[in-house]
């Protein structure tokens, strides 16, 4: 490798620029995920080739297949990274809630964190909502699995807030997650993430939707 600093060998083989083989592989993986986020959001999954992703990431095609089995595998890994980030934000926000916090206000604050996780970086929203429907059969299964997990997280939040939860709470939670996703996806068609008024309008819509959905929690 021209210009690389080789520092000798360690447990992971020779070190290049201070990184062993596993660390370099992890770096390539993140570079490919970053490139996929950029290209999938700009031109869509179907119109993006592995060669374009490799060029964007400055990674050789051979190295790509050392990390991912194909474009679909990369796409699913990108969705997983987004889920981990969103989950981290929501978990931190949930942990920060006070014990005497008003349940409705706390839920709205969590929804705001949920929306911000997607609209703070419009690329994340485009990949999640613009490419999230039936890109491939496996991607659709993946999407459904993530939504079920998100609904379970919502149920955990309701329990944490001490809200009365009916036996059909999981169905209500699934409807809430699906609705939140669709509201954000629809807003992205015309909304501008850089305009405070547009983001305030999105939050107001999400708040109203949550008010309607949560009204069904205590019904039998």
Model-derived regions, located:
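Secondary-structure edge/capping motif, primarily at the C-terminal ends of alpha-helices
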Residues: 90-97, 128-132, 160, 187-191
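Amphipathic alpha-helical segments used for helix-helix packing
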Residues: 106, 117-137, 154, 182-189
């Amino acid at each position: 490798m021209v210009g690389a600093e080789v520092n000798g060998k360690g447990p992971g083989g020779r070190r290049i620029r201070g990184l062993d083989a596993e660390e370099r592989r992890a770096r390539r993986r993140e570079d490919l995920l970053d490139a996929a986020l950029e290209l999938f959001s700009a031109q869509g999954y179907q119109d993006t080739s592995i060669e374009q992703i490799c060029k964007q990431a400055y990674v050789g095609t051979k190295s790509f297949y050392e990390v991912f089995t194909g474009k679909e595998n990369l796409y699913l890994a990108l969705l997983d990274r987004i889920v981990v980030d969103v989950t981290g934000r929501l978990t931190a926000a949930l942990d920060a809630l006070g014990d005497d916090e008003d349940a409705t206000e706390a839920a709205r604050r969590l929804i705001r964190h949920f929306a911000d996780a997607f609209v703070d970086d419009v690329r994340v929203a485009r990949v999640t909502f613009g490419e999230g429907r039936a890109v491939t059969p496996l991607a659709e299964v993946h999407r459904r699995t993530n939504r079920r997990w998100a609904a379970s997280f919502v149920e955990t939040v309701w329990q944490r807030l001490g809200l009365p939860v009916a036996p059909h709470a999981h169905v209500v939670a699934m409807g809430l997650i699906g609705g939140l996703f669709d509201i954000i996806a629809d807003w992205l068609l015309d909304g501008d993430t850089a305009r405070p008024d547009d983001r305030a309008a999105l939050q107001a819509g999400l708040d109203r939707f949550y008010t309607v959905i949560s009204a069904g929690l205590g019904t039998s």
